[in-house]
Amino acid sequence: MSMFLDTAKIKVKAGKGGDGMVAFRREKYVPNGGPWGGDGGHGGNVVFVVDEGLRTLMDFRYNRRFKADDGEKGMTKGMHGRGAEDLIVRVPQGTTVRDADTGKIITDLVENGQEFVIAHGGRGGRGNIRFATPKNPAPEISENGEPGEERNLELELKVLADVGLVGFPSVGKSTLLSVITAAKPKIGAYHFTTIVPNLGMVRTKSGESFAVADLPGLIEGASQGVGLGTQFLRHIERTRVILHVLDMSASEGRDPYEDYVAINNELETYNLRLMERPQIIVANKMDMPEAEEHLEEFKKKLATNYDEFEELPQIFPISGIAHQGLENLLEATAELLEKTPEFLLYDESDFQEEEAYYGFNPDEPEFAISRADDASWILSGDKLEKLFTMTNFDRDESVMKFARQLRGMGVDEALRARGAKDGDIVRIGKFEFEFVD
Protein backbone atom coordinates (compact mmCIF):
# COMPACT_ATOMS: atom_id res chain seq x y z
CA MET A 1 0.00 0.00 0.00
CA SER A 2 1.34 3.44 -0.89
CA MET A 3 1.97 5.73 2.04
CA PHE A 4 -0.75 8.29 2.73
CA LEU A 5 0.61 11.78 3.27
CA ASP A 6 -1.89 14.25 4.71
CA THR A 7 0.45 17.04 5.82
CA ALA A 8 3.26 18.76 3.95
CA LYS A 9 5.48 21.80 4.37
CA ILE A 10 6.37 23.70 1.22
CA LYS A 11 7.80 27.02 0.10
CA VAL A 12 6.30 29.11 -2.69
CA LYS A 13 7.82 32.11 -4.40
CA ALA A 14 6.09 34.26 -6.99
CA GLY A 15 8.03 35.70 -9.91
CA LYS A 16 9.92 38.98 -9.74
CA GLY A 17 8.74 41.78 -11.99
CA GLY A 18 10.94 42.53 -14.98
CA ASP A 19 13.33 45.51 -14.71
CA GLY A 20 12.43 48.71 -16.51
CA MET A 21 14.82 49.88 -19.23
CA VAL A 22 16.76 53.08 -19.80
CA ALA A 23 16.90 53.75 -23.55
CA PHE A 24 16.79 56.76 -25.86
CA ARG A 25 15.32 57.23 -29.27
CA ARG A 26 18.06 57.55 -31.85
CA GLU A 27 16.72 57.83 -35.37
CA LYS A 28 17.74 59.77 -38.41
CA TYR A 29 15.86 63.04 -38.70
CA VAL A 30 14.62 62.75 -35.08
CA PRO A 31 16.94 64.96 -33.04
CA ASN A 32 16.71 64.80 -29.26
CA GLY A 33 14.40 61.81 -29.55
CA GLY A 34 13.85 61.49 -25.82
CA PRO A 35 13.41 58.44 -23.56
CA TRP A 36 12.30 55.16 -25.11
CA GLY A 37 12.77 52.51 -22.41
CA GLY A 38 9.77 50.27 -21.70
CA ASP A 39 8.42 48.76 -18.48
CA GLY A 40 9.22 45.29 -17.22
CA GLY A 41 6.59 42.55 -17.29
CA HIS A 42 4.63 41.35 -14.26
CA GLY A 43 6.04 38.37 -12.36
CA GLY A 44 4.02 35.16 -12.36
CA ASN A 45 1.66 34.33 -9.48
CA VAL A 46 1.65 30.97 -7.70
CA VAL A 47 -1.92 29.64 -7.89
CA PHE A 48 -3.40 26.64 -6.05
CA VAL A 49 -6.06 24.78 -8.05
CA VAL A 50 -8.23 22.00 -6.58
CA ASP A 51 -8.04 18.76 -8.57
CA GLU A 52 -10.60 16.08 -7.65
CA GLY A 53 -8.31 13.45 -9.20
CA LEU A 54 -5.73 13.86 -6.44
CA ARG A 55 -6.18 11.90 -3.23
CA THR A 56 -3.03 12.61 -1.20
CA LEU A 57 -0.30 15.20 -0.67
CA MET A 58 2.32 12.64 -1.71
CA ASP A 59 3.62 14.80 -4.58
CA PHE A 60 4.68 17.45 -2.07
CA ARG A 61 7.01 15.00 -0.32
CA TYR A 62 9.35 15.08 -3.32
CA ASN A 63 8.77 18.63 -4.50
CA ARG A 64 8.72 21.19 -1.72
CA ARG A 65 9.69 24.37 -3.58
CA PHE A 66 7.53 26.10 -6.16
CA LYS A 67 8.74 29.20 -7.98
CA ALA A 68 6.91 31.12 -10.69
CA ASP A 69 8.81 32.70 -13.59
CA ASP A 70 10.03 36.30 -13.52
CA GLY A 71 8.64 38.94 -15.85
CA GLU A 72 10.69 39.96 -18.88
CA LYS A 73 12.76 43.14 -18.81
CA GLY A 74 11.51 46.24 -20.56
CA MET A 75 12.74 46.83 -24.09
CA THR A 76 13.66 49.71 -26.34
CA LYS A 77 11.07 51.52 -28.49
CA GLY A 78 8.94 51.78 -25.35
CA MET A 79 7.98 48.11 -25.52
CA HIS A 80 6.95 46.40 -22.32
CA GLY A 81 8.45 43.10 -21.24
CA ARG A 82 6.17 40.07 -21.39
CA GLY A 83 4.38 39.18 -18.17
CA ALA A 84 5.19 35.70 -16.82
CA GLU A 85 2.58 32.95 -16.79
CA ASP A 86 1.17 31.86 -13.45
CA LEU A 87 2.53 28.70 -11.87
CA ILE A 88 -0.37 26.29 -11.30
CA VAL A 89 0.00 23.96 -8.30
CA ARG A 90 -2.67 21.25 -8.09
CA VAL A 91 -3.93 20.15 -4.67
CA PRO A 92 -6.55 17.58 -3.54
CA GLN A 93 -10.05 18.52 -2.43
CA GLY A 94 -10.12 19.19 1.30
CA THR A 95 -6.71 20.88 1.52
CA THR A 96 -6.31 23.48 4.25
CA VAL A 97 -3.46 25.97 3.72
CA ARG A 98 -1.74 27.57 6.71
CA ASP A 99 0.95 30.20 6.97
CA ALA A 100 3.82 28.24 8.53
CA ASP A 101 5.20 31.38 10.19
CA THR A 102 1.99 32.55 11.88
CA GLY A 103 0.03 29.28 12.14
CA LYS A 104 -3.05 31.06 10.76
CA ILE A 105 -5.27 29.50 8.10
CA ILE A 106 -5.00 31.23 4.73
CA THR A 107 -7.64 29.28 2.81
CA ASP A 108 -9.67 26.07 2.82
CA LEU A 109 -9.85 24.47 -0.64
CA VAL A 110 -12.85 22.16 -0.97
CA GLU A 111 -14.50 22.62 -4.39
CA ASN A 112 -13.18 21.00 -7.55
CA GLY A 113 -11.64 23.65 -9.80
CA GLN A 114 -11.42 26.23 -7.00
CA GLU A 115 -8.46 28.59 -7.47
CA PHE A 116 -6.53 30.68 -4.96
CA VAL A 117 -3.55 32.98 -5.59
CA ILE A 118 -1.23 31.99 -2.76
CA ALA A 119 1.72 34.21 -3.78
CA HIS A 120 1.43 37.34 -5.91
CA GLY A 121 4.00 38.16 -8.56
CA GLY A 122 5.88 41.47 -8.41
CA ARG A 123 4.94 44.30 -10.72
CA GLY A 124 7.34 45.26 -13.46
CA GLY A 125 9.73 48.17 -12.96
CA ARG A 126 9.04 51.34 -14.93
CA GLY A 127 11.24 52.31 -17.85
CA ASN A 128 12.67 55.80 -18.29
CA ILE A 129 9.84 56.78 -20.64
CA ARG A 130 7.69 56.97 -17.47
CA PHE A 131 9.93 59.51 -15.73
CA ALA A 132 10.09 62.19 -18.42
CA THR A 133 9.01 65.64 -17.23
CA PRO A 134 9.27 69.13 -18.71
CA LYS A 135 12.20 69.78 -16.36
CA ASN A 136 13.89 66.47 -17.15
CA PRO A 137 12.88 65.39 -20.66
CA ALA A 138 15.64 62.76 -20.95
CA PRO A 139 15.78 60.97 -17.58
CA GLU A 140 18.31 58.22 -16.95
CA ILE A 141 15.99 56.65 -14.41
CA SER A 142 14.42 53.20 -14.35
CA GLU A 143 13.09 50.86 -11.70
CA ASN A 144 13.99 47.29 -10.93
CA GLY A 145 11.12 44.85 -10.90
CA GLU A 146 9.31 44.29 -7.62
CA PRO A 147 10.20 41.02 -5.83
CA GLY A 148 7.54 38.32 -5.87
CA GLU A 149 5.78 37.29 -2.69
CA GLU A 150 7.47 34.45 -0.82
CA ARG A 151 5.73 32.23 1.75
CA ASN A 152 6.33 29.19 3.91
CA LEU A 153 3.20 27.05 3.95
CA GLU A 154 1.75 24.05 5.75
CA LEU A 155 -0.73 21.96 3.79
CA GLU A 156 -3.17 19.70 5.62
CA LEU A 157 -5.56 17.29 3.90
CA LYS A 158 -8.90 16.30 5.37
CA VAL A 159 -10.92 13.84 3.32
CA LEU A 160 -14.33 14.94 2.10
CA ALA A 161 -17.08 12.58 3.19
CA ASP A 162 -20.63 12.98 4.50
CA VAL A 163 -20.32 10.04 6.88
CA GLY A 164 -17.31 8.87 8.85
CA LEU A 165 -16.89 5.36 10.27
CA VAL A 166 -15.14 5.49 13.64
CA GLY A 167 -14.17 2.79 16.07
CA PHE A 168 -11.25 0.84 17.45
CA PRO A 169 -9.08 -1.16 15.04
CA SER A 170 -10.56 -4.46 13.85
CA VAL A 171 -14.18 -3.69 14.76
CA GLY A 172 -15.17 -4.26 11.11
CA LYS A 173 -15.20 -0.77 9.57
CA SER A 174 -13.35 -1.78 6.41
CA THR A 175 -15.57 -4.83 5.93
CA LEU A 176 -18.67 -2.69 6.37
CA LEU A 177 -17.43 -0.14 3.81
CA SER A 178 -16.64 -2.84 1.26
CA VAL A 179 -20.15 -4.29 1.65
CA ILE A 180 -22.15 -1.05 1.43
CA THR A 181 -20.05 0.61 -1.32
CA ALA A 182 -17.88 -0.35 -4.28
CA ALA A 183 -14.75 0.57 -2.32
CA LYS A 184 -12.10 -2.13 -2.02
CA PRO A 185 -10.19 -1.42 1.19
CA LYS A 186 -7.45 -3.81 2.24
CA ILE A 187 -8.79 -5.87 5.11
CA GLY A 188 -6.94 -8.01 7.61
CA ALA A 189 -7.44 -9.43 11.09
CA TYR A 190 -4.86 -7.19 12.74
CA HIS A 191 -4.69 -3.69 14.13
CA PHE A 192 -4.06 -0.58 12.05
CA THR A 193 -5.03 -2.27 8.79
CA THR A 194 -6.46 1.00 7.52
CA ILE A 195 -3.67 3.52 7.08
CA VAL A 196 -5.24 5.41 4.20
CA PRO A 197 -8.79 6.81 4.52
CA ASN A 198 -10.93 4.75 2.15
CA LEU A 199 -13.81 6.50 0.42
CA GLY A 200 -16.92 4.94 -1.08
CA MET A 201 -20.32 6.04 -2.37
CA VAL A 202 -23.50 4.53 -0.90
CA ARG A 203 -26.80 4.44 -2.77
CA THR A 204 -29.84 3.40 -0.75
CA LYS A 205 -32.87 1.58 -2.14
CA SER A 206 -34.85 4.82 -1.90
CA GLY A 207 -32.33 6.49 -4.23
CA GLU A 208 -30.40 8.59 -1.69
CA SER A 209 -26.62 8.67 -2.06
CA PHE A 210 -23.79 9.84 0.19
CA ALA A 211 -20.03 9.48 0.62
CA VAL A 212 -18.65 7.32 3.43
CA ALA A 213 -15.08 7.32 4.72
CA ASP A 214 -13.56 4.41 6.61
CA LEU A 215 -10.99 6.33 8.63
CA PRO A 216 -7.75 5.01 10.14
CA GLY A 217 -8.19 2.97 13.31
CA LEU A 218 -8.26 4.94 16.53
CA ILE A 219 -6.86 4.11 19.95
CA GLU A 220 -6.90 5.87 23.30
CA GLY A 221 -4.47 8.78 23.32
CA ALA A 222 -5.05 9.57 19.65
CA SER A 223 -5.83 13.21 20.41
CA GLN A 224 -2.29 13.46 21.83
CA GLY A 225 -0.86 11.86 18.69
CA VAL A 226 -0.58 8.25 19.92
CA GLY A 227 -0.75 5.64 17.16
CA LEU A 228 -2.29 7.07 13.99
CA GLY A 229 -3.79 9.64 16.30
CA THR A 230 -4.27 13.10 14.91
CA GLN A 231 -4.10 11.77 11.33
CA PHE A 232 -7.41 10.01 11.99
CA LEU A 233 -9.02 12.90 13.82
CA ARG A 234 -8.04 15.39 11.13
CA HIS A 235 -10.13 13.50 8.57
CA ILE A 236 -13.26 13.13 10.65
CA GLU A 237 -13.57 16.92 10.98
CA ARG A 238 -15.30 17.24 7.60
CA THR A 239 -17.96 14.57 8.18
CA ARG A 240 -21.54 15.49 9.10
CA VAL A 241 -22.68 12.18 10.61
CA ILE A 242 -20.60 9.67 12.55
CA LEU A 243 -21.26 5.92 12.43
CA HIS A 244 -19.71 4.59 15.62
CA VAL A 245 -18.85 0.95 14.89
CA LEU A 246 -18.54 -1.42 17.88
CA ASP A 247 -17.53 -5.08 18.04
CA MET A 248 -20.45 -6.58 19.99
CA SER A 249 -18.82 -10.00 19.97
CA ALA A 250 -16.04 -8.61 22.22
CA SER A 251 -13.80 -11.04 20.32
CA GLU A 252 -10.65 -9.24 21.44
CA GLY A 253 -11.62 -9.23 25.10
CA ARG A 254 -12.65 -5.55 25.22
CA ASP A 255 -15.92 -4.21 26.62
CA PRO A 256 -17.93 -2.56 23.79
CA TYR A 257 -19.19 0.16 26.14
CA GLU A 258 -15.68 1.04 27.30
CA ASP A 259 -14.63 1.25 23.63
CA TYR A 260 -17.56 3.58 22.96
CA VAL A 261 -16.64 5.92 25.83
CA ALA A 262 -12.93 5.89 24.96
CA ILE A 263 -13.49 6.85 21.32
CA ASN A 264 -15.88 9.67 22.24
CA ASN A 265 -13.38 10.99 24.77
CA GLU A 266 -10.75 11.19 22.04
CA LEU A 267 -13.13 13.01 19.70
CA GLU A 268 -14.02 15.52 22.41
CA THR A 269 -10.40 16.08 23.45
CA TYR A 270 -9.27 16.75 19.89
CA ASN A 271 -12.08 19.12 18.96
CA LEU A 272 -15.14 19.87 21.05
CA ARG A 273 -17.22 20.46 17.93
CA LEU A 274 -16.83 16.82 16.86
CA MET A 275 -19.27 15.82 19.59
CA GLU A 276 -21.92 18.09 18.05
CA ARG A 277 -22.15 15.71 15.10
CA PRO A 278 -25.00 13.21 15.40
CA GLN A 279 -23.90 9.61 15.94
CA ILE A 280 -25.48 6.31 15.03
CA ILE A 281 -24.20 3.32 16.98
CA VAL A 282 -23.46 0.35 14.72
CA ALA A 283 -23.47 -2.87 16.74
CA ASN A 284 -21.38 -5.06 14.44
CA LYS A 285 -20.59 -8.80 14.42
CA MET A 286 -24.06 -9.70 15.72
CA ASP A 287 -23.72 -13.11 14.02
CA MET A 288 -21.10 -14.08 16.62
CA PRO A 289 -21.79 -16.00 19.87
CA GLU A 290 -22.74 -13.89 22.91
CA ALA A 291 -23.18 -10.75 20.80
CA GLU A 292 -26.86 -10.45 21.84
CA GLU A 293 -25.95 -10.57 25.54
CA HIS A 294 -23.22 -7.96 25.05
CA LEU A 295 -25.67 -5.69 23.21
CA GLU A 296 -28.23 -5.84 26.02
CA GLU A 297 -25.50 -5.06 28.55
CA PHE A 298 -24.32 -2.17 26.37
CA LYS A 299 -27.83 -0.68 26.18
CA LYS A 300 -28.17 -0.78 29.98
CA LYS A 301 -24.84 0.98 30.52
CA LEU A 302 -25.66 3.56 27.85
CA ALA A 303 -29.05 4.36 29.42
CA THR A 304 -27.47 5.09 32.82
CA ASN A 305 -25.57 8.03 31.29
CA TYR A 306 -28.66 9.72 29.84
CA ASP A 307 -31.46 11.34 31.82
CA GLU A 308 -35.10 10.76 30.95
CA PHE A 309 -35.30 13.92 28.80
CA GLU A 310 -32.28 13.10 26.63
CA GLU A 311 -32.65 11.17 23.42
CA LEU A 312 -30.50 8.05 23.21
CA PRO A 313 -28.43 7.53 20.06
CA GLN A 314 -29.94 5.13 17.53
CA ILE A 315 -28.48 1.61 17.70
CA PHE A 316 -28.49 -0.70 14.67
CA PRO A 317 -27.47 -4.35 15.15
CA ILE A 318 -25.74 -5.59 11.99
CA SER A 319 -23.29 -8.12 10.63
CA GLY A 320 -21.01 -6.76 7.94
CA ILE A 321 -19.78 -10.20 6.93
CA ALA A 322 -23.26 -11.78 6.89
CA HIS A 323 -24.83 -8.67 5.23
CA GLN A 324 -27.49 -8.45 7.98
CA GLY A 325 -29.30 -5.26 9.06
CA LEU A 326 -27.54 -3.04 6.51
CA GLU A 327 -30.57 -1.67 4.68
CA ASN A 328 -32.17 -0.16 7.80
CA LEU A 329 -28.83 1.33 8.85
CA LEU A 330 -28.28 3.05 5.50
CA GLU A 331 -31.83 4.45 5.28
CA ALA A 332 -31.52 5.88 8.81
CA THR A 333 -28.14 7.40 7.92
CA ALA A 334 -29.59 9.05 4.80
CA GLU A 335 -32.49 10.49 6.85
CA LEU A 336 -30.09 11.88 9.46
CA LEU A 337 -27.91 13.46 6.77
CA GLU A 338 -30.98 15.11 5.25
CA LYS A 339 -31.62 17.12 8.44
CA THR A 340 -28.00 17.69 9.51
CA PRO A 341 -26.37 20.93 8.31
CA GLU A 342 -22.70 21.24 7.45
CA PHE A 343 -20.47 22.15 10.37
CA LEU A 344 -18.08 25.08 10.26
CA LEU A 345 -14.59 23.64 10.52
CA TYR A 346 -12.99 26.82 11.74
CA ASP A 347 -13.89 29.96 13.58
CA GLU A 348 -13.36 33.20 11.67
CA SER A 349 -10.54 34.08 14.07
CA ASP A 350 -8.57 31.06 12.76
CA PHE A 351 -8.18 32.68 9.35
CA GLN A 352 -5.43 35.07 8.41
CA GLU A 353 -6.65 38.23 6.74
CA GLU A 354 -5.27 38.43 3.24
CA GLU A 355 -4.47 42.08 2.58
CA ALA A 356 -4.32 43.49 -0.93
CA TYR A 357 -0.77 43.03 -2.10
CA TYR A 358 -0.42 46.65 -3.15
CA GLY A 359 -2.84 47.92 -0.54
CA PHE A 360 -2.08 50.88 1.72
CA ASN A 361 -2.17 50.26 5.44
CA PRO A 362 -2.20 53.60 7.31
CA ASP A 363 -1.41 51.90 10.63
CA GLU A 364 1.78 50.31 9.34
CA PRO A 365 4.93 52.46 9.95
CA GLU A 366 6.82 53.25 6.76
CA PHE A 367 10.19 52.46 8.33
CA ALA A 368 11.97 51.62 11.58
CA ILE A 369 15.43 52.62 12.82
CA SER A 370 17.65 50.48 15.05
CA ARG A 371 21.31 50.62 16.13
CA ALA A 372 23.73 47.78 15.35
CA ASP A 373 26.58 46.66 17.64
CA ASP A 374 29.10 48.41 15.39
CA ALA A 375 27.23 51.72 15.93
CA SER A 376 25.82 51.77 12.38
CA TRP A 377 22.16 52.61 11.80
CA ILE A 378 19.79 49.96 10.42
CA LEU A 379 16.77 51.02 8.37
CA SER A 380 13.94 48.49 7.91
CA GLY A 381 10.29 48.36 6.92
CA ASP A 382 8.31 46.84 4.07
CA LYS A 383 7.72 50.05 2.13
CA LEU A 384 11.30 51.25 2.49
CA GLU A 385 12.77 47.86 1.56
CA LYS A 386 10.46 47.67 -1.46
CA LEU A 387 11.68 51.09 -2.67
CA PHE A 388 15.25 49.94 -2.14
CA THR A 389 14.92 46.71 -4.13
CA MET A 390 13.21 48.54 -7.00
CA THR A 391 15.93 51.19 -7.27
CA ASN A 392 18.43 50.78 -10.09
CA PHE A 393 21.72 51.69 -8.38
CA ASP A 394 23.61 51.51 -11.68
CA ARG A 395 22.07 54.85 -12.62
CA ASP A 396 23.04 58.01 -10.73
CA GLU A 397 19.66 59.62 -11.35
CA SER A 398 17.90 56.57 -9.86
CA VAL A 399 20.11 56.80 -6.76
CA MET A 400 19.30 60.51 -6.40
CA LYS A 401 15.60 59.72 -6.79
CA PHE A 402 15.87 57.13 -4.01
CA ALA A 403 17.58 59.70 -1.75
CA ARG A 404 14.73 62.14 -2.38
CA GLN A 405 12.18 59.43 -1.55
CA LEU A 406 13.92 58.73 1.76
CA ARG A 407 13.86 62.43 2.62
CA GLY A 408 10.18 62.60 1.68
CA MET A 409 9.43 59.70 4.03
CA GLY A 410 11.19 61.57 6.86
CA VAL A 411 14.14 59.17 7.15
CA ASP A 412 16.81 61.93 7.29
CA GLU A 413 14.90 63.82 9.96
CA ALA A 414 14.31 60.66 12.01
CA LEU A 415 18.01 59.73 11.87
CA ARG A 416 18.99 63.19 13.10
CA ALA A 417 16.46 62.91 15.94
CA ARG A 418 18.04 59.58 16.95
CA GLY A 419 21.50 61.20 17.06
CA ALA A 420 22.97 60.30 13.66
CA LYS A 421 25.95 62.44 12.70
CA ASP A 422 27.68 63.32 9.44
CA GLY A 423 29.66 60.30 8.21
CA ASP A 424 27.72 57.66 10.20
CA ILE A 425 27.11 54.37 8.37
CA VAL A 426 23.47 53.63 7.47
CA ARG A 427 22.42 50.16 6.26
CA ILE A 428 19.43 48.87 4.33
CA GLY A 429 19.80 45.11 3.98
CA LYS A 430 23.31 44.47 2.64
CA PHE A 431 23.61 47.97 1.18
CA GLU A 432 25.37 50.69 3.19
CA PHE A 433 25.95 54.39 2.70
CA GLU A 434 27.18 57.40 4.68
CA PHE A 435 24.78 59.78 6.36
CA VAL A 436 25.34 63.32 5.09
CA ASP A 437 23.98 66.06 7.33
From Swiss-Prot:
<feature type="domain" description="OCT">
    <location>
        <begin position="359"/>
        <end position="437"/>
    </location>
</feature>
<dbReference type="Pfam" id="PF09269">
    <property type="entry name" value="DUF1967"/>
</dbReference>
<feature type="domain" description="OBG-type G">
    <location>
        <begin position="161"/>
        <end position="338"/>
    </location>
</feature>
<dbReference type="GO" id="GO:0005737">
    <property type="term" value="C:cytoplasm"/>
</dbReference>
<dbReference type="InterPro" id="IPR045086">
    <property type="entry name" value="OBG_GTPase"/>
</dbReference>
<dbReference type="InterPro" id="IPR036346">
    <property type="entry name" value="GTP-bd_prot_GTP1/OBG_C_sf"/>
</dbReference>
<feature type="binding site">
    <location>
        <begin position="192"/>
        <end position="196"/>
    </location>
    <ligand>
        <name>GTP</name>
    </ligand>
</feature>
<keyword id="KW-0460">Magnesium</keyword>
<dbReference type="InterPro" id="IPR006169">
    <property type="entry name" value="GTP1_OBG_dom"/>
</dbReference>
<dbReference type="InterPro" id="IPR027417">
    <property type="entry name" value="P-loop_NTPase"/>
</dbReference>
<dbReference type="GO" id="GO:0042254">
    <property type="term" value="P:ribosome biogenesis"/>
</dbReference>
<dbReference type="GO" id="GO:0003924">
    <property type="term" value="F:GTPase activity"/>
</dbReference>
<dbReference type="InterPro" id="IPR006074">
    <property type="entry name" value="GTP1-OBG_CS"/>
</dbReference>
<dbReference type="GO" id="GO:0005525">
    <property type="term" value="F:GTP binding"/>
</dbReference>
<dbReference type="InterPro" id="IPR036726">
    <property type="entry name" value="GTP1_OBG_dom_sf"/>
</dbReference>
<feature type="binding site">
    <location>
        <begin position="167"/>
        <end position="174"/>
    </location>
    <ligand>
        <name>GTP</name>
    </ligand>
</feature>
<comment type="similarity">
    <text>Belongs to the TRAFAC class OBG-HflX-like GTPase superfamily. OBG GTPase family.</text>
</comment>
<keyword id="KW-0342">GTP-binding</keyword>
<feature type="binding site">
    <location>
        <begin position="319"/>
        <end position="321"/>
    </location>
    <ligand>
        <name>GTP</name>
    </ligand>
</feature>
<dbReference type="InterPro" id="IPR006073">
    <property type="entry name" value="GTP-bd"/>
</dbReference>
<dbReference type="Pfam" id="PF01926">
    <property type="entry name" value="MMR_HSR1"/>
</dbReference>
<protein>
    <recommendedName>
        <fullName>GTPase Obg</fullName>
        <ecNumber>3.6.5.-</ecNumber>
    </recommendedName>
</protein>
<feature type="domain" description="Obg">
    <location>
        <begin position="2"/>
        <end position="160"/>
    </location>
</feature>
<keyword id="KW-0378">Hydrolase</keyword>
<feature type="binding site">
    <location>
        <begin position="214"/>
        <end position="217"/>
    </location>
    <ligand>
        <name>GTP</name>
    </ligand>
</feature>
<keyword id="KW-0479">Metal-binding</keyword>
<comment type="function">
    <text>An essential GTPase which binds GTP, GDP and possibly (p)ppGpp with moderate affinity, with high nucleotide exchange rates and a fairly low GTP hydrolysis rate. Plays a role in control of the cell cycle, stress response, ribosome biogenesis and in those bacteria that undergo differentiation, in morphogenesis control.</text>
</comment>
<keyword id="KW-0963">Cytoplasm</keyword>
<dbReference type="InterPro" id="IPR031167">
    <property type="entry name" value="G_OBG"/>
</dbReference>
<dbReference type="GO" id="GO:0000287">
    <property type="term" value="F:magnesium ion binding"/>
</dbReference>
<feature type="binding site">
    <location>
        <position position="174"/>
    </location>
    <ligand>
        <name>Mg(2+)</name>
    </ligand>
</feature>
<dbReference type="InterPro" id="IPR015349">
    <property type="entry name" value="OCT_dom"/>
</dbReference>
<dbReference type="Pfam" id="PF01018">
    <property type="entry name" value="GTP1_OBG"/>
</dbReference>
<dbReference type="InterPro" id="IPR005225">
    <property type="entry name" value="Small_GTP-bd"/>
</dbReference>
<dbReference type="InterPro" id="IPR014100">
    <property type="entry name" value="GTP-bd_Obg/CgtA"/>
</dbReference>
<feature type="binding site">
    <location>
        <begin position="284"/>
        <end position="287"/>
    </location>
    <ligand>
        <name>GTP</name>
    </ligand>
</feature>
<comment type="subunit">
    <text>Monomer.</text>
</comment>
<keyword id="KW-0547">Nucleotide-binding</keyword>
<feature type="binding site">
    <location>
        <position position="194"/>
    </location>
    <ligand>
        <name>Mg(2+)</name>
    </ligand>
</feature>
